[in-house]
Amino acid sequence: MKAEILFPEVCNLYGDLQNIYYLKRCCPALEIIETDLHSKPRFLTEDVALVYMGSTTEQGLRLAADALRPYAADIAAKADAGQLILLTGNAPDVFSDAIESDSADTIEGLGILPGRVRYTMMKRHNSFFLGTFDGMEVVGFKSLFGFHYDAPERGGWFRITRGVGRTPESKLEGFCRGGLYATALIGPLLILNPPLCKW
């Protein structure tokens, strides 16, 4: 069984990569593939159980978007066919239509997830999160510069109990599309939520 980490050289903030290394400790037979920015993602041509991409810097977002853009249609098709893809932190922003910022040029996203992300760099949001999914509670942390706008209020991953969602007003957090699960929660998501990890 294989798990692929996309771009660990830049998508490595907040200890997000420990989500995958935790799985390796739970299942020593798991083979971890680390795909760099200059390589085609292996899950597009090989059997990979889980694809993971974590948080990165604003420059890292641009690099990741540029690296994945040639494969956007193939990634969307794989997700729709059930390929398990987990995106945490600001990684989902790359998969949106675009990332707009008050202090940088707009980054064209992959258009796999709906809506646009708007960053206000001097208004960082930090909070705890409590939500529900499939009968279980999910806890986590958020630290972000912006929110997802112009996305329909459906297709979320978690329902909010406390904290904020895609926008401060939304009751949904994250996105689901086929086998793609995306959340703005950062850090050891799977370690903090064993039932979610088992799911």
Where are the regions a protein language model picked out?
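N-terminal beta1-alpha1 cap of cysteine-dependent amidohydrolase-like domains
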Residues: 1-80, 191-198
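Short coil/turn connectors at secondary-structure junctions
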Residues: 47-48, 81-83, 105-108, 136-138, ...
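Pocket-forming structural segment of enzyme catalytic cores
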Residues: 102-174
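A glycine-centered loop/beta-turn motif at secondary-structure junctions
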Residues: 166-199
